[in-house]
């Protein structure tokens, strides 16, 4: 196993522990707590894949961080922080919408790279909006936290989420997954639109009808229906 993979996991475990302590002292806001829950699932998946114990990895990560901090001067830390572009966290969904449990009468699921697409194929003839919570860096989608499809009544009928065992994805991964989800929902005569915020930062554009400019590849996925894909 690559030692850098192990040390990265160890440091991530320790930093999650520090953030958990911050949350326990009620010092974290809603986006902070949201990322904390998502990262916990990701760490569990990575630990299972790597065959590493999270508690043991957390202790090892603490030693790595302490060693680095001893070697790091305040001036070097300031320079490092100044050179790293700052990311922003954008929310279409409330914390309640993100954490709400939902059920599918006709569940369908597809793994598309590092993302999992789920939808209820029993939903027909509805107006649906796709909302997402994600981080942005340099005015471009950086990391998708969660995307969900809502009817006008507020019912959740679809979802795109990162796979805990496969951390890391690109904005192209997200756009491809959105194309597949739209195709599946439209197969049952639903009308689907994407939130203006997600359009702006994933596609760098915004259409009044809520439809992003999908690539020919994504359009083929839509035309081919989702029955064989999700």
Swiss-Prot record:
For region RNA-binding and homodimerization, the annotated ranges are: 1-73
Per UniProt, the keywords (alphabetical) are: Eukaryotic host gene expression shutoff by virus, Host cytoplasm, Host gene expression shutoff by virus, Host mRNA suppression by virus, Host nucleus, Host-virus interaction, Inhibition of host innate immune response by virus, Inhibition of host interferon signaling pathway by virus, Inhibition of host PKR by virus, Inhibition of host pre-mRNA processing by virus, Inhibition of host RIG-I by virus, Inhibition of host RLR pathway by virus, Interferon antiviral system evasion, RNA-binding, Ubl conjugation, Viral immunoevasion
User: What effect is documented for mutating residue 41 to A?
Assistant: Complete loss of suppression of RNA silencing in Drosophila cells
Q: Which Pfam families match?
A: Flu_NS1
Q: Where is this region: Disordered?
A: 205-230
Where on this chain is Nuclear export signal (motif)?
A: 137-146
Q: Name one GO cellular component term.
A: host cell cytoplasm
Q: Which family does it belong to?
A: Belongs to the influenza A viruses NS1 family.
Q: What is this protein called?
A: Non-structural protein 1
Encoded by which gene? NS
